[in-house]
From Swiss-Prot:
GO terms for molecular function: 16S rRNA (adenine(1518)-N(6)/adenine(1519)-N(6))-dimethyltransferase activity; RNA binding. The lineage of its organism: Bacteria, Bacillati, Mycoplasmatota, Mycoplasmoidales, Metamycoplasmataceae. Transmembrane segments: none annotated. Coiled coil: none annotated. Its main location: cytoplasm. It comes from Mesomycoplasma hyopneumoniae (strain 7448) (Mycoplasma hyopneumoniae). Specifically dimethylates two adjacent adenosines (A1518 and A1519) in the loop of a conserved hairpin near the 3'-end of 16S rRNA in the 30S particle. May play a critical role in biogenesis of 30S subunits. This is Ribosomal RNA small subunit methyltransferase A.
Length: 259
């Protein structure tokens, strides 16, 4: 069988650690579940998914890996799609679970693609750069708290499960990875979500500035004063100091009273 060759421009670091693969699948109930795996790679994790899940659909962008995967998993409950997940039309109706070992350079884009299609998923387990995992689960008043923290925690209850060292991959990445679980919230509304994402992105446009100096780029002084008076904010408050609930209220206030 042809040996898979990692491609640097695709950010490929193939998982090779059996204990890590087992740990990932043990953190979620896969029985009778239909799974989407983004990036099969060598099919190492796919093997463990197929042992437990009802069906696995894999999006793999690297066409050189397709014949290897097809031969390895012949007659298995697996569908392999040679396509960039970012360009894929997600036409299924039944909710699915996503499991993926994501290239570091494209993590945020894939996350926001998933978020935009939140009604199609119930859970996500992602292997990401440890630094990104810290941003996803970050709390207010911490250095890693960001619009990604807010977006992730708006969509789901998020939990950093465990850290994975470079030795678990081929080739070895230069930094640690981490596995993060997203358990999607119920009763999410697409319009409210889009408004929240748009508003929080504006608030974190210039992270070192005060909230006021971020808002001034799209609001006038009277509108900002209306917000500050209603929420009783201190003049020097910064975007990192406000929690998720406050941002939800802020976005609602903006779209209902100012926009």
């Amino acid at each position: 069988m042809q040996k898979p060759v990692p491609k640097k421009h695709l950010g490929q670091n193939f998982l090779k650690d059996r204990k890590i693969a087992e740990k990932i699948v043990e953190n979620i109930d896969l029985k009778n579940k239909e799974i989407i795996e983004i990036g099969c790679g060598t099919g190492f994790l796919t093997n463990f998914l197929l042992e437990r899940a009802k069906f696995v659909t894999c999006y793999e962008i690297d066409r050189n890996l397709i014949p290897i995967l097809e031969k390895k998993f012949k007659n298995k409950n697996l569908r392999i799609i040679n396509e960039d997940f970012l360009l894929a039309e997600l036409e299924f109706k039944e909710k699915k679970t996503i499991i993926a070992n994501l290239p570091y350079y494209i993590t945020s884009k894939i996350l926001f693609k998933i978020f935009a299609n939140f009604e199609k998923f119930d859970k996500i387990i992602l292997m990401v750069q440890n630094e990104v995992a810290d941003r996803i689960v970050a709390k207010p008043k911490t250095p890693t708290y960001s619009k990604l923290s807010l977006a992730s925690q708006y969509i789901a209850d998020v939990k950093k499960l465990f850290v994975v060292g470079p030795d678990s991959f081929f080739p070895k990445p230069k930094v640690n990875s981490a596995v993060v679980l997203f358990d999607f919230r119920e009763n999410l509304e697409a319009k409210k979500m889009e408004e929240f994402f748009w508003f929080t992105k504006k608030c974190f446009q210039f992270k070192r500035k005060t909230l006021y100096n971020n808002l001034i780029f799209f609001l006038n002084k009277q509108q900002i004063e209306k917000i500050y008076n209603f929420f009783q904010f201190a003049q020097n408050i910064r975007p990192q100091q406000l929690d998720l609930v406050t941002y939800i209220r802020l976005a609602d206030f903006y779209f209902n009273n100012i926009f």
